[in-house]
Structure formats: C-alpha cells, structure tokens
Regions:
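Solvent-exposed, non-transmembrane regions of membrane-associated and secreted proteins
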Residues: 1-69, 77-82, 90-145
C-alpha cells in the first residue's frame, strides 16, 4: 500500500477479530493491516485498513493519517496483480466510545476504502488514545501493479 501524500509505503498484514468482536489491531507499528473479513480493496463496499499512529514511542505507519486531504491517492497492490487506486474524500475524528461503526464500515454502493488509526488525546490511565481517525476514500481506477 502506498499513500504518497504522507510518505506511506507499507505491506499489509491480515487482521481478524478479537474476542469482543472488534477488529484486531496490527501487532506492531508497521505494517498496516487489512481486515480480511471485509472485501478486497477495489471490490464493492469498503475495504478496511488499520495502522498504528505510534508504537513504543516511535511514529507508526499511520502517524500522519490526519494530514490526508481530499484528492490524495491511496494505492493498494492486490494479489491478483492489479493495484486499486483510491481518492480520499474526507478525514474525520471520532471518539472511540461513540465510534460510528455502521457509518464507517457499513455497506455502500461502490468500492470504497477506510483507513483507520488512533487520534485525539492520550489517556495515560487506559494507555490508549481517546479517538479514532478515519480516512474515507473511493475507488477511481485499477491498474497493473
């Protein structure tokens, strides 16, 4: 996966679910992870890719995700030898305790992509960020990888 606007070039690890039914986060700051129960990037409805904002005191793969702007490209190489090219249309911040799962991950009538990381202030007691950053993107083309 490449996101030129924020200098991301990362392979994708497969991610499943945790015991509580939420998506398992990537095991470290790199690489980003694709939720394998969601569609392959470029198929109908949104594919979901998550990455850490930081890890062990160092920037993670999605450290600059909040800096994406509408029009920025995300390129995801697929196992079929094609690359899905997406265009970011918005980036939003949501409180984790009010994360709109249906609005972010729910069905849409086109091929989309959601990039998700942590954001907001850091809760020292919980050792977690209070918010999530979600970038919304739509497929614009496929090309040879």
């Amino acid at each position: 996966m490449q996101i030129p606007a924020i200098a991301v070039d990362s392979p994708l690890a497969g991610l499943g679910l945790q015991h509580d039914g939420t998506m398992r986060p990537p095991p470290a700051g790199f690489p980003a992870g694709w939720y394998t129960s969601a569609p392959t990037p470029g198929q109908l409805v949104p594919a979901i890719i998550a990455g850490h904002v930081d890890w062990a005191g160092h920037p993670g793969v999605f450290h600059n995700l909040r800096d994406l702007k509408p029009g920025d490209q995300v390129i995801v190489a697929r196992t079929d030898g094609r690359a899905a090219v997406f265009r970011v249309n918005r980036v939003e911040e949501f409180a984790k305790d009010a994360f709109p799962t249906g609005a972010v991950n729910g069905n849409i009538d086109h091929a989309g992509l959601r990039l998700i990381t942590c954001g907001g202030s850091f809760d020292q007691q919980a050792a977690s960020y209070r918010d999530n950053i979600a970038a919304f993107a739509d497929l614009v083309s496929t090309q040879n990888a």
